[in-house]
Amino acid sequence: MRTIVMTGGTSGIGEVAARQILATPDTRLLLGTRGRGQDGAESVRLDLTRLADVRSFVEGVNDRLGTSEIDALVLNAGENQPNGDGRTPDGFETSFVVNYLAHYLLLRLLSPRLADGAVVSLTTSGTHDPEEDTMLPPPRHADAALLAHPDRDPDRDAEPRVAAGRAYSAANLCTILAVRALALQPEVVAKNVTVLAYDPGPTPGTGLLRNAPAVANVAWRVFGGLLRRMVRRYNSKEAGGAHLGAIALGRVNPPAGRYYAAVRRDALTWLEPSKLARDDRVRDVLWRDSASLVGLQP
């Protein structure tokens, strides 16, 4: 029996991936959700804006696992905020927590339950890379303290939507750095765990822009097919979900030294992330400072 723990499996590419997982014999899916989950999945309550809820989710997963181990940990949830003013109950900027810090905490707390040869996948975005030239402003840094408390950042963008976009891209940069750091942890190395950053690319038809202005949200969700025909770089929700499902099911073997899996024109490719994402010093400082924010040792 293959056991998969997943966040972000109720809509968009995650919903497609979860259906694929649930259709696979001898596979068990534990799904973090704020509401109703997928039929056939074991739903465990999870609100990523609350770190206490993240810890409760881990307790629920551990209770359901019993003596079993996790064969795939798929952290796919994420969303874009309308501005940079949102704060979580812990006092941190919302986009930073939902798109990165909560998943960092999940990584730290669930890593001991990973099976030998397990797969860990964190969903990220090409917005982290200035060379991708996306619609969102690229990150300036991966300073966890400033991203958690952007009011302290002397270079914070004055325009709310620009600040929100940069918060999102910075959180996705942090995700890739965390993937690189996790792969170096002794318990992960000892278990021969595959750790990947998964970028589904721009994918109309998903709920990523649920917090955006109504016109943009409707266009993104409802007119996905038309947008894909107009902009060739856009991917389909079905392709993005199928690749994510294949990763979760252990059907993707990354080339040696590759960890950044990116969907481009519906095909899975292996790319180098941005220069900042490859900076070892930035990686190590982020891992340490993220631990401090969630009350753990590095």
Model-derived regions, located:
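C-terminal helical subdomain
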Residues: 224-271, 281
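Glycine/proline-rich active-site loop of Rossmann-fold NAD(P)-dependent oxidoreductases
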Residues: 188-191, 208-212, 250-255
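Rossmann-fold NAD(P)H-dependent dehydrogenase/reductase core
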Residues: 1-206, 296
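C-terminal amphipathic/interface module of NAD(P)-dependent oxidoreductases
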Residues: 274-298
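Short, flexible, mixed-charge acidic loops at enzyme active sites
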Residues: 135-140, 211-220, 262-265
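Alpha-helical membrane-targeting segments
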Residues: 153-165, 202-239
